Amino acid sequence: MLPAGDASDGEAAQPPACAIVLVSNGPGELSTWVRPLAERLHALQPLRPRDPRAACALRLVLVPCPNATGQEHRVARDWGLFERVLPAARFWWLLLRPRRHGPWPARGVVVFLGGDQFWTVLLSARLGYRHLTYAEWVARWPRWNDRIALMGPAAAGRLPRRWRQRAMVVGDLMADLSDQARQDEPLPAGDWVALLPGSKRAKLLVGVPFLLETADRLAALRPGSRFLLPVAPTTSVRELLAYGGPANPLLRGRAVGEPRLQDGELITPAGTRIRLLERHPAHGALSQCTLALTTVGANTAELGALGVPMIVLVPTQHLEVMQAWDGWMGLLARLPLLRRLVGVALTAWRMRHRGFLAWPNISAGRAVVPERVGPIEPAQIAAEAADWLDHPERLAAMADDLRSLRGAPGAVAAVAAMVRGLLPPA
């Protein structure tokens, strides 16, 4: 649906003359790539829906992704940045019959910001729009791109020489996150520890009780520690409370109490208070944390971009965590007859062959942040976190290392300028 406008205003009711179509997939890309670029584009020129009379509309198309939660389109709609948001479930129908999803202007630009790059090749060809790809590591279809924005020299080196005139190294889109985040409201003084258990049910089943117990133990070791937990847009406070209590099937048979909610804080049965952040993205608060305890995934990329030291946790004692992984291993882990037999073997194989799991480590090719994989326990992680907090110079060194990987800000502005350069003249 188009946003409602003044029905008596003929100019406002006119369809847009062009469209900028951002294409993405999972929740991490939406918060770290799509939203900053969309905000920048709105700041640079009039765009619908913020300006109903604008000649150009900003739209979002989501593509299939095994890591998606299915709620990304609702999250993006709430931002108020896009005239239209198309869920991933309708992507194939968009390719087959685009007119069924509303009128599409004759001219426009398709921008790849996550997923499989081939989807934007197909979509730009189907709509007859120009095409720009933001490539982290490799631009796979340079022949069918009008422009290519590259994250760094490594991606540029992988591009065939004949296509390099179309490309420009812009930097990491997430490098702007820290500067933007620090404009938000400051947290009260203290050593804040962020708890990030994940966004999907399989990870939350394991991550929430693990991190709540870790917080209890860390609070006992360091009573001055303060805790916050960003509530993923794909879950709710009520669900978090259920994951942390006896309703969690992984906790059956254990004498566990019920966490409760009071004044925007989750209070564990042991009395530890954890501030819940329902604003998304929570970059402002996260950027002020001294340390983060997080699962694998896009969380590690966001924390790295914000320069927040972290310990990355992959507890493998519950097979259910395997169901949150993508690809054939996650599918096998869901099979009721096979998952018990193959679970241990799959976990061992992945941990042996995958290498680094945290994005800062993958990007650097070395251990920038600690990864704790295996049958880890909350007491072990609490002791390690306390040791890090007792040595602020080590935390500062990790933060400096993360900032050096992030690179200089400015990528969002550079990509926005490339998008505008592909638009038809006004």
Q: Across the structure, where does each feature detected by a protein language model lie?
A:
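Nucleotide-activated sugar donor-binding and catalytic core shared by glycosyltransferases
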Residues: 1-426
